[in-house]
């Protein structure tokens, strides 16, 4: 019997970062929004190192951001780069997937907008239903819980592409 790798998926955003810690898509260890204040590189890296110490992951999954279509702030790009640097120091394999990769995977399940992806994820993980944000209007900021769905989408994209 093979042992599943411990996977940590991190999706930095304006509130901190969405995260999922799992062995497989069906074996979730922990997930949520890690509020990071102040929003500084050092605080994000501290949180990453805490997760690594606590869960001992064998794989790190991050948002890719080099595609022309990806809109990402310099702050988030720097945080992702710092996560990569820390994972490399610890010889942890890193997998990165862009928003385009995520959309391509979820298009097969009925939609590729953030809202449609979130609805698909809640159909697979009913325990996330209370976190499900309403459809966002252009005049509203992104819902606090969307980071959880972003992290789940990233984790599921990894398993879909790699398996």
Ranges and model annotations:
Residues 1-163:
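Phosphate- and other anionic-substrate recognition elements at nucleic-acid/protein interfaces
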């Amino acid at each position: 019997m093979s042992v599943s790798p411990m996977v940590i998926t991190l999706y930095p955003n304006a509130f901190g970062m969405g995260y999922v810690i799992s062995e497989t898509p069906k074996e979730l260890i922990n997930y949520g929004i890690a509020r990071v204040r102040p929003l500084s590189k050092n605080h994000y890296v501290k949180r990453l190192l805490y997760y690594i110490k606590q869960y001992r992951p064998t794989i790190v999954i991050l948002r890719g951001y080099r595609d022309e279509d990806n809109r990402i702030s310099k702050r988030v790009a720097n945080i992702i780069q710092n996560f990569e640097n820390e994972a490399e120091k610890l010889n942890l394999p890193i997998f990165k997937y862009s928003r385009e990769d995520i959309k391509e995977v979820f298009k097969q399940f009925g939609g590729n907008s953030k809202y449609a992806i979130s609805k698909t994820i809640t159909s697979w993980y009913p325990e996330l239903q209370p976190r499900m944000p309403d459809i966002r209007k252009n005049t509203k900021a992104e819902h606090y819980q969307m980071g959880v769905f972003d992290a789940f989408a990233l984790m599921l994209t990894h398993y879909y592409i790699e398996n």
